[in-house]
């Protein structure tokens, strides 16, 4: 094992995560229909600051992400600062790492803390699948640019006459990889076939996710980390994730048809995470700054790792690559973990990563490591359910996982937890957290 890389400031301070909060997550076109991601971000940051009772001017940086970006608000981070009453001098910039976006936001704030340029910051992300940047065809876009430069009405009419009816149709956001044309569901199908993951195994994992998430809500475990929101017309409160199917049965999952490979596939809408709206954020600061403000941290960021692999095959194996690196940098092994939380983009992807984490052959032949990362103990894995149940507002999921894991570690008396996610483009992320 290589030498551990401690995440501390020049003064030896650990990176503390003092608070975390999210909105409830809503299925597309339901509770947050018509509310853009920037407004969801404002909601959660405003409430996070109010609950923490930290002076707004104590926050020196805000790093926020949005995967499905809106042209009218390209820097969501700065809009959140300006729209929440924070000090206008607060540094703010936006990041995007697909489904691992808020992992990246947390890492960026942590790096600023370690560099000594700030002492406290906010990291998070928001996405809306209900408010989308509907575009125009390339032909229409080109004509519109040329029309803007045309000098006469005749020139403008000539340009418009070149268009066909199909050129006027709206163009929804792409769901396929730009470089390959493959949808993430196509890759999930490929991984299911490559690693021998059955439909029954996928449905069982999805069922487990919903049951555990429903139980977590029923036992009140999520109440402290999920805010109550009010959407127009501001009459009905929305305070719990609305995708969780606690009353479903395994037989219900078996009824759905494959969503990607219609003839021979096993990936369905039920064993995949749905399109979702929501936002999440965490407050990070140096350990000494937390003490100055009289705050007890939820926990600490022990290490993190980002990886990238080929996109043509096994694109969603990011956790199998990033997990051993994050553990190594933390000076830990799989056996040292109290909790292991993996983003469930698809049940097939999740099960493939779990399989390869315990594979000596994968470790040796692919990762170039002497031994497997380690089998994931089922009693430690996604103990409160995962993204299949909660939903997946792309940029918010990482912050949800971090906050949820730290709260659960505290309930268990402390220890180490690892959170990890795959992301589009063959990217992966993992973070080791510590709670006392």
From Swiss-Prot:
Name the chemical reaction catalysed here: an acyl-CoA + acetyl-CoA = a 3-oxoacyl-CoA + CoA
Main localization is cytoplasm
Give any Gene Ontology cellular component: cytosol
Q: Which residues form the active site?
A: 99 (acyl-thioester intermediate), 392 (proton acceptor), 422 (proton acceptor)
Pathway linked to the protein: Lipid metabolism; fatty acid beta-oxidation
Q: Which GO terms describe its molecular function?
A: acetyl-CoA C-acyltransferase activity
Tell me which UniProt keywords the record has, alphabetically: Acyltransferase, Cytoplasm, Fatty acid metabolism, Lipid degradation, Lipid metabolism, Transferase
Residues in coiled coil: none
Q: What is annotated about its quaternary structure and interactions?
A: Heterotetramer of two alpha chains (FadJ) and two beta chains (FadI).
For this protein, the record's NCBIfam families field holds:
AcCoA-C-Actrans, FadI, PRK08963.1
Instruction: Give the record's family classification.
Output: Belongs to the thiolase-like superfamily. Thiolase family.
Reported function: Catalyzes the final step of fatty acid oxidation in which acetyl-CoA is released and the CoA ester of a fatty acid two carbons shorter is formed.
According to UniProt, the name of this protein is 3-ketoacyl-CoA thiolase
Q: Which organism is it from?
A: Salmonella arizonae (strain ATCC BAA-731 / CDC346-86 / RSK2980)
